[in-house]
A protein has these predicted regions:
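A short, charged, amphipathic alpha-helix used as a generic interaction element across diverse proteins
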Residues: 21-38
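Short aromatic-glycine-(Arg/Gly/Cys) micro-motifs in beta-strand/loop hairpins
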Residues: 1-10
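A contiguous, mid-protein "functional segment" used to position or interact
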Residues: 288-306, 310
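S-adenosyl-L-methionine
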Residues: 57-76, 304-333
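Glycine-centered tight beta-turn/hairpin loop motif at sheet-sheet or coil-to-beta transitions
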Residues: 10-12, 62
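Short, mixed-charge low-complexity intrinsically disordered segments
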Residues: 35-56
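A short, exposed loop/beta-hairpin motif centered on an aromatic-Gly-Thr core
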Residues: 12-20
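Core catalytic lobe of class I
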Residues: 53-296, 339-344
């Protein structure tokens, strides 16, 4: 982690002046100092102080939305804090020069260097490394959600099992508006998978069973979620190639956390996780290597601080709108426990 080290040197000298008042005396000395008629030097040295602090990309005024710029496999080793929940959308390793259809146009599916795959062994090692670091950042009763496709989800599942997690569910997100398959040689890709796992085999996790029934017309919530892909209004502040919709993240957060919870996203991108968290009265830390996407994240949070935008978002996200109508008190902020805040 990058740090800012502030060096404060205190120099002190007493000047004697003839003046009509104390205020006038101070003005005279200030003027002489501004003109460099008075220059303090080493003989005036009194003390020196060093103060070290983490270099943050952004921290909102309400302290509920924090961004770190850098590699999560490095940054997660640099601070001590336990989160209630983690959501991760790691690289899928599918940027191989292929093409797809987006808004009626043929587009390249290359996301960037961060999404280019290596050997199966290197992908497995990468997943074990970051998942192990995340495990150390979870409370004992905490849970982790990891999104993926067939390109990486099996590697992720193996890593979770090897590291001692208990897999609770594998959610199938069935997109109601997927892009078409233009090769016409196999079925259209219309799903993504989200593994939900708890840190410990023995320590119980939190699941908001009744709330999930409430948003599912009084029936048990199943592990197949019919939800749309990203909507244009969610990209007003900029585009991220793998941005998740608020409908998906809101359901995840509602299902597995309480108001006031701390949520981590180690591959935050444009921070849909953080926006959903703040819409629901939770707090958020996001980490990403790409400054371009952190700029989008910051813009989205600043946009959300507008009261009208905040209200508009709540009406557009299906589960939130339903709960707002039926149980508005659910979204009241709880008091944070004393000292329960990030260490930076």
């Amino acid at each position: 982690m990058e740090y800012q080290v502030t060096i404060t040197e205190i120099l002190s000298r007493t000047e004697r002046v003839e003046a009509s008042s104390a205020l006038m005396a101070e003005k005279m000395v200030r003027l002489r100092y501004a003109k460099e008629d008075i220059v303090l030097d080493y003989s005036d040295f009194k003390s020196v102080d060093f103060h070290t602090s983490e270099s943050l990309f952004f921290k909102s005024e309400d302290r509920a939305f924090t961004l770190l710029h850098g590699d999560s496999t490095r940054l997660l080793n640099e601070f001590d804090f336990k989160f209630d929940m983690i959501f991760a959308d790691p690289p899928y390793f599918l940027s191989n020069g292929g093409i797809s259809i987006q808004s009626g146009r043929v587009v390249c599916v290359d996301k960037g260097e961060w999404d280019r795959g290596g050997t199966p062994e290197s992908i497995d090692a990468f997943n074990r490394e970051w998942i192990s670091l995340c495990r150390n950042k979870l409370k004992d009763n905490g849970t982790i959600w990891i999104s993926g496709t067939y390109h990486n989800i099996f590697s992720v599942a193996n890593a979770l099992t090897e590291l001692g997690f208990k897999i609770l569910n594998v959610i199938t997100w069935a997109k109601t508006n997927p892009p078409p398959n233009i090769s016409c040689r196999y079925f259209t890709y219309s799903t993504e998978f989200i593994i939900w796992a708890r840190k410990s085999e023995k320590v119980p996790h939190f699941y908001n069973y009744d709330l999930m029934k409430q948003v599912n017309e009084g029936k048990q919530m199943r592990d197949v979620w019919q939800l749309p892909a990203i909507a244009p209004w969610e990209k007003r502040c900029g585009k991220h190639p793998t941005q998740k919709p608020l409908s998906v993240l809101s359901r995840i957060i509602l299902a597995s956390t309480k108001p006031g919870a701390w949520i981590l996203d180690p591959f935050t991108g444009s921070s849909t996780t953080g926006i959903a968290a703040n819409l629901l009265g939770r707090r958020f830390l996001g980490i990403d290597k790409e400054e371009e996407y952190l700029e989008i994240s910051r813009a989205r949070k600043l946009e959300l601080e507008d009261v009208r935008t905040f209200a508009s978002y709540r009406k557009k996200v299906k589960d939130i709108a339903l709960l707002d109508k039926d149980s508005p008190s659910l979204f009241a902020h709880e008091e944070a426990p004393p000292g329960y805040d990030l260490p930076f």
